[in-house]
Amino acid sequence: MSHQATYVGRPGDAIDLARAAQIAARGAGLAALESGCHMVEAHGHAARADSASCAASLNAAERAYSRADSSHPAWLDYFDSAYLSAKTAHCFRDLGDYARAAQFAEQSLNMTDGYLRGRAFNLCLLASALADEDPHEAARIGTEALDIVGGLESHRTHAYLRDVRHRLAAHIDLPDVDHFRRQVFTITTRAD
């Protein structure tokens, strides 16, 4: 719920929900889950442009992650260093630190096979971090995400693609960027 609260623009609720979940995760002895809860709190702080609180939550997430072991429930298998990198990239992107966002988004692509939608998210995250500095590369990476998405009916995936499209708007004069933006428009308007 905390992640969803950030996604719908309610970072204060995201922070409150993440803090409550941290208590439950600690009580259950699930360090990986606790780390994830700190990450979601960090993202809430980033959405509020509170870099100091975001950094504190990122550090808490790292500490909790270092205590995690492999004996967690199967439903936590998705939570690995690639996932942690993706969440960190989100934070830095939302804080406007695009170089660090790109660094962590690149690391997030070292993810477990089989999570196609997650890979598309991470590619979009990298493309959005690169949009200002290297629009050609952002369009290329965004196109890679489009290829993965194919016929996926995912509102969130389309939101990620629209975000990249929006961030590339200043570079519409570049043919590859314009082509990517048109593809995103076609795919997301047809599906939504």
What feature does the model see in each segment?
Residues M1-D192:
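Conserved binding/catalytic microenvironments
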